[in-house]
Design a protein with these regions (language model features):
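Membrane-embedded alpha-helical bundles that constitute the cytochrome b-like, heme-associated redox core
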Residues: 1-203
């Protein structure tokens, strides 16, 4: 979908979602009010994104699926579930849709947020083949190594596995460093999916 001046609405929405995602992950620095405001905008963008890509859902029931198509469906389905969990628990925490206990909503919001972040990186990697544009693969694996180091440093795994009820951020970390590190972690999963697809196409 394009506007009169040739602006691709899908790309605008996608870039907007990426920026919102980073800001939402920076909750320790933005505070609750801004986080809720950004979260509501993210939900709106998410709905628009799926509306603009509604034809993809119709294609699910057509023909036999390849391994890569099955991977697409799996990642997108898990992402849809995790973002639904983020939205539902977030609206509960904000007091708009109190359908579960505050304790459950808090745990659900933290876990689903990190899974959504990881899956969003994989989702972008399905559509954006960054590794094809980088001739030197050493650079690709170097960036991935940095992502792995920052993934470990920020203890992302404990949030994915629901091993912590709270988000821990060092007092020495500022918002710019925090967002840069999370961006590198996001890029790690984009590149990881690029590598996976590349290997699948070889078989």
């Amino acid at each position: 979908m394009r506007l009169e001046r040739g602006i691709d609405v899908r790309k605008v929405i996608d870039v907007g979602m990426m920026m919102l995602l980073l800001l939402l992950m920076a909750f320790p620095f933005t505070g609750q009010d801004i986080h809720i405001f950004l979260g509501i905008i993210m939900i709106a963008f998410f709905i628009i994104h799926h509306y603009l890509n509604r034809r993809w859902y119709l294609s699910l029931f057509k023909g036999k699926k390849t391994k890569i198509q099955i991977l697409f469906i799996t990642i997108n389905s898990l992402l849809l579930i995790s973002i639904f969990g983020v939205a539902l628990s977030g609206l509960t925490l904000a007091g708009y849709v109190p359908i579960m206990s505050y304790f459950l909503a808090r745990k659900m919001h933290l876990v689903c947020s990190y899974w959504s972040y990881l899956l969003m990186g994989l989702h972008v990697g399905l559509h954006l083949q960054v590794t094809k544009r980088i001739k030197n693969q050493i650079i690709v694996y170097g960036i991935m190594l940095i992502g792995i180091i920052l993934f470990t440093k920020n203890q992302i795994l404990i949030y994915l596995l629901n091993m912590s009820e709270f988000l821990y951020v060092s007092d020495r970390t500022n918002m710019i460093i925090y967002m840069f590190e999370y961006l590198m972690i996001f890029i790690l999963f984009v590149l990881l999916m690029n590598v996976i697809i590349k290997e699948m196409k070889k078989k």
